[in-house]
Every structure is written in structure tokens, then in C-alpha cells.
């Protein structure tokens, strides 16, 4: 799966490297998968197989390194990620808590491996953890490296809220305690900065907004054939929380009033094994509505396929059923001049207000989405204006360069405010 957080972190690291900084992007759990040039290191720390074994069998918490290398190898981890295993938050409660306990958790050996490696590296000026679920590392890293610790925030609440009790409460308590070792949090949207400040009980002064940015190589504006079908698109992970079922319902309502003109609904994105039945059900619903021939799932796409897919759309919508904190898919669609219709929740309003690249409607309202599609279908001038505004807005505010500039300022401020700590 192309993970949105991995895409963001890899794009940021690549841009910082291009700007002359020394950057080490270290994979955790599994090798980084991105549809751009991968700048992450080859060695994976906290290999997913080791973490799992150490969680469930005490023997593996004490095995020597030469044995660990067998299941920490890249080939073994890649093989494991290809297995069709359901990975849902409820089944990961104990593991999440253990990881957040840091050196008191079952993965203490893995922390030792990471610290041993870091001691041999040139001294870092700052360390940035990719998400709050790794905050069990904050105190050990600060103690050993004597440098400021930052933590990106990019969607942890959805995972945490999906944990069964007592794991959710235990995890939140551990994150809140570990936050004392963090010098700055980097939420990827203003919405998420405000929300996570309250959710985690972290002072607003520790929140530093670090907007998303994308690498625009290859993102040229679409050239649509007006004689073809009006194409509504969905580009995100195929799962209930991303709202494909909401979009299918909206499309059916849209087609109820536009049967005289050709149209289609295209979807693309990663489909996890546990959500195959979800997609099958949606396909069946479209068939019952007499629209099966207009609905197509294109699968998971590489970078070239993704850009070509987006360029084939007249409008894109990902009506997420939760408050999405990122919305990289919006930036990618707008970058090729495709207008979007989105629910007014999460980070969507601030992205559209800043770019002007789409229409906001009430959340969980299929009729409102359908009306947005009809508005764009009936008014080609409006569709073109929104598409042009979105493309310009992304280039003005949401490039990898803009993201790197902001993060540079945050890092510099954190280093400047942090008094030098004595080294061991």
C-alpha cells in the first residue's frame, strides 16, 4: 500500500536533501513504500515480524542479533506485507500499549538496537518521529542523543479511537505522559493542530502547523474531451471511513436527474483484504441501481497511473465519514486542474478556502454532493475556473518546497530554543 504518511515524509526528506541538509529517513516496521524516488534508508528498525514475535513470545525478546537479522531482512518484511492479513486497530491494542511503554514494553530490545545505531551516526540537530504512536521512543532518544525531539501528527486519532478498551485509554495516557519529552508537535493541518491540542492535552504553544506539500513532477493539467462521459472520481484507500459508499449513493442520486447524458464513476486506491466484501457490496448496489456498467474500480495505481487517472476526471470527491486531517488526494487532483466536491469537515475547508479549487457541502449529505456534481456538469465555465484556481492554489501553497520551508523554520526555532544538553 502507498501510505499517505509515507508519501508525505519521503517527499519532505527528499526536498530537505535537495536544499542541502543532511537527512536520515529511517523506516519503521516495514520498508517505506512510495511512488516517488525513495530516499529512506535500507535498514528497517522495529521490523514488523520482530515486534510481533516479541509481543507474543518472551523467547524472542532475548534472541541474539544474528537470528533477528533473519526476520528483519528486507525480503522477509516484504514477503510479510504481501500476506493477506487483516490489520485492524482492535487487534493491535496490546501491541500499541507495549510500544508506547518504550523501554518498559516488550520491544525494549528493538529500542536498544536503534540507540546503538544512532550512537554511531554523526550527531543530529533534531529528531522527528513520524506519528504519536511512536512516542515511547521520545524519552530514550532525548536521553541518549541530547537533542530536541519533534513529532508529526497526521491521523493518529482515528486509529486510537478504534482501539477497544482498556487499550485506548491506556494508549492516550501514555502518549500524554510522553509528550513532556517532545519539544514540538507538527500537525499537518490547522484543524488537526486545534483538535490534537485538546485531544492529547498538549499546550497550543507546542503545536506548529506544518502544511502538506506534494512533488509536482508530472502533474500537468488535464485536457478533457467534452464529448466523453462526465467522470466522477474517487482516489483514496477503499474503506468505509473514506466514504466510497457515500459517493456511490450520491452518484445514484446524481444520475437520477442526469440520465440523458453519459457519465461514469471511477474509483482507485488500495483495497485491504478485510474490505473486499465492502467493495463487493457497493458493486452490487450499483448493479441494483442499474449503474453497474458506469462503475469501475481501477485498483492501486503507481505514480504514472495515478496522474493519468486524475487527468481523466471531471470532478473528484472523497466524502470521508470522519474528520480527515490530511487530504493529500485533494492536492493531487487539484494539481492537474480537477475540481473537487468535499464535505465540510476536518482539513477539507482550510484546503479549499486556501486554493479555491472546489465546492464544500454539508457532511454526510449525498444530495448535496449530487447537487455539486450537477453544478459542475451544467456549468463548464465554473468547472474550468475552479480547476484553474485549484492548480494555481496548490502551486502557491502546497508544494514540497513550501512544506520544507515551513519545517525548516520549525526545526530552527526548536533548536534555537533548546539549551545545549551535556553529552555522555
PLM segments and residue spans:
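Nucleotide-activated donor-binding/catalytic signature segment of Leloir-type glycosyltransferases, i.e.
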Residues: 279-304
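Short hydrophobic beta-strand element within catalytic cores of glycosyltransferases
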Residues: 339-342
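Conserved acidic donor-binding segment of nucleotide-sugar-dependent glycosyltransferases
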Residues: 354, 359-366, 375-380
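Conserved donor-binding/catalytic core segment of Leloir-type glycosyltransferases
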Residues: 225-242, 248-252, 266
